[in-house]
Amino acid sequence: MNHATSELHDESAVSIVPETTRLQDLSALVKMGIVNSNTLTVFTGFWLALHFNGLSVMDNLDKLFFTIVGSALIMAGVCCLNNYIDRDIDPLMERTKNRPTVTGKYKPGFALAFGLVILLLGFVFLLLTTPMAVLISFIGAFTYVVLYTLWTKRKYTLNTVVGSISGAVPPLIGWAAIDPSLNHPIAWMLFLIMFIWQIPHFLALAMKRVDEYRNAGIPMLPVVQGFDITKRQIMIWTVCLLPLPFYMSGLGITFMVIATLLNIGWIALGLYGFRQQDDIKWSVKMFVYSLNYLTILFVSMIVVTFF
């Protein structure tokens, strides 16, 4: 449930709608890229809950199926609702101007109905695991659709922080499907990692797309406060990730070393280019690093449990 950002600059020419298949349109409607990336964090939470509770994945294949399918449907549902709500500003932004709710491939009513149906279906699937998993997923969905998309996205620079709450719950959903008590510290470290990671990730993207956000009237931090303050905020949040691996000693020294090196690498990259290159180039490097960071970190959490 990680939150998706959207963009574009003014164009005087009439936009040409690209030819797309029905599958491509559906993928854009539910934002499959977001669903796929968040599914990794759901699975990681599920896997680590099994590991620390001494359970076998083979004995919990049914719960794994319900958890992955349920959480994926919920994420797809809230993304549909996001497309429905943002259909008035999506034409103003480059990455979203060809979404099916903008081009007319899907009518707004369909996007709304389809989003609600698969959202509810996702809750049903998760109900076959634990009520806590349903509760956490509801909190994530409510935060993304209501608190982020409907309320803060168009009004406050804190929209990034609010959206990061919803993006941080997927690993907790996975964990709660196995261990609804959520009393293991690593479960909450997963939440904190995802919450903190999203802020420099999306602020870097906002720097890259600053003109498009400005034209669309979305008050992202670089639009309102400029690049200098945004860069400082990116560095502050990146540094906040540094101590977290040391609260995850249960995963072993190998993981702690990998995570610490990833954190140091991100900080070093930010400091190295902080005043030595143009701001857009810096933001692109920070954004790309953040993507690789998250994938390597969460895959590492799974791999180290085999040794």
Curated annotation (Swiss-Prot):
PANTHER family: PROTOHEME IX FARNESYLTRANSFERASE, MITOCHONDRIAL. It is a multi-pass membrane protein. One of its GO terms (cellular component) is plasma membrane. Its main location: membrane. Belongs to the UbiA prenyltransferase family. Protoheme IX farnesyltransferase subfamily. It catalyses: heme b + (2E,6E)-farnesyl diphosphate + H2O = Fe(II)-heme o + diphosphate. Pfam families: UbiA. Keywords: Cell membrane, Heme biosynthesis, Membrane, Transferase, Transmembrane, Transmembrane helix. Pathway: Porphyrin-containing compound metabolism; heme O biosynthesis; heme O from protoheme: step 1/1. It is found in: Cell membrane. It comes from Bacillus mycoides (strain KBAB4) (Bacillus weihenstephanensis). Its EC number is 2.5.1.141. Carbon 2 of the heme B porphyrin ring is defined according to the Fischer nomenclature. It is an enzyme of class 2 (transferase). InterPro entries: Protohaem_IX_farnesylTrfase (IPR006369), UbiA_prenyltransferase (IPR000537), UbiA_prenylTrfase_CS (IPR030470), UbiA_sf (IPR044878). NCBIfam families: cyoE_ctaB. The chain crosses the membrane at residues 32-52, 65-85, 108-128, 131-151, 158-178, 186-206, 251-271, 287-307. GO terms for biological process: heme O biosynthetic process. This is Protoheme IX farnesyltransferase. Interacts with CtaA. Converts heme B (protoheme IX) to heme O by substitution of the vinyl group on carbon 2 of heme B porphyrin ring with a hydroxyethyl farnesyl side group. GO terms for molecular function: protoheme IX farnesyltransferase activity.
